[in-house]
A protein has these predicted regions:
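A small/polar active-site loop signature that marks catalytic segments
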Residues: 1-155
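Small-residue-rich helix-loop
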Residues: 84-242
């Protein structure tokens, strides 16, 4: 995957969102689609710099919403990495690196009011890296910042999974005041389960929340306990805002 994946401590500058075991997934999929249409490609594929006289034949770009929807609703990590590098490319142009992305995220954290943003470790776009370190406080400050910017909030909130309805929360909090109310992103890595997002309390107050449970796993039931605790907290917040 690139930076932050433990085996890349040699500061490898090649960072692509769809890179597995030195195999370019995009090129493989593209060649496969060409073959389906009777077009066969010989030789090897890889990444190279374009010659100065190269002409663009075609450009395909998906709307941001169509990428962020599966990224947030279904926790699609491919999309998350792609958005991370697309953000850097938009700001810096070709040759985007993870380090540039890390700098951009920390600047946004500072703008959102996160104190000492440099102390947090942001190394990738998906959050799957074992080197990522954030806190519930930092996440709530980012959620608050989005809420304070109406266009961002309206766009972002409607793409989050909805409790008891869709995405990674479709089977959770059903039959409670949190169902259809909680809009939140789940997070799952080894030993960690998290949930952060928004809900509306019974008094009409809008609440941003972040819950991170560490030291849990699926083998001893602690992961399920963590999810149940998260759901219960959301139910209590939705029913009893005091």
């Amino acid at each position: 995957w690139g930076a932050g994946w433990c085996w890349d401590d040699d500061d490898n500058p090649l960072l692509l969102p769809l890179k597995y075991d030195n195999k370019d997934t995009f090129a493989d999929v593209f060649i496969s689609r060409l073959r389906q249409r009777g077009i066969y490609v010989s030789g090897s594929q890889g990444t190279k710099a374009l010659p100065s006289g190269a002409k663009e034949v075609s450009s395909v770009s998906r709307p941001l919403r169509s990428v962020m929807r599966p990224m947030l609703k279904n926790s699609n990590n491919h999309c998350a990495e792609s958005v991370f590098y697309a953000m850097v490319h938009h700001a810096y142009g070709n040759g985007a690196t993870a380090r540039q992305g890390q700098t951009m995220v920390r600047k946004l954290m500072t703008k959102a009011g996160v104190s000492n943003a440099a102390s947090y470790d942001i190394v990738d776009g998906s959050g799957l890296s074992l080197y990522d370190y954030v806190s519930p406080h930092a996440e709530v400050m980012m959620l608050r910042h989005a809420w304070q910017n109406k266009d961002v909030y309206d766009f972002f909130r409607h793409l989050l999974p909805v409790a008891g309805s869709d995405g990674t929360l479709r089977r959770r909090m059903r039959g409670t005041r949190a169902a259809g109310n909680v809009h939140a992103k789940t997070g799952t890595v080894t030993g960690v389960r998290s949930l952060c997002g928004y809900l509306t309390a019974s008094n009409g107050h809008h609440i941003a929340f972040s819950i991170i449970n560490q030291g849990v796993n699926g083998d001893d039931g602690t992961a399920a306990q963590a999810r149940n605790m998260q759901d219960r907290i959301c139910e209590l917040l939705a029913s009893n805002p005091q």
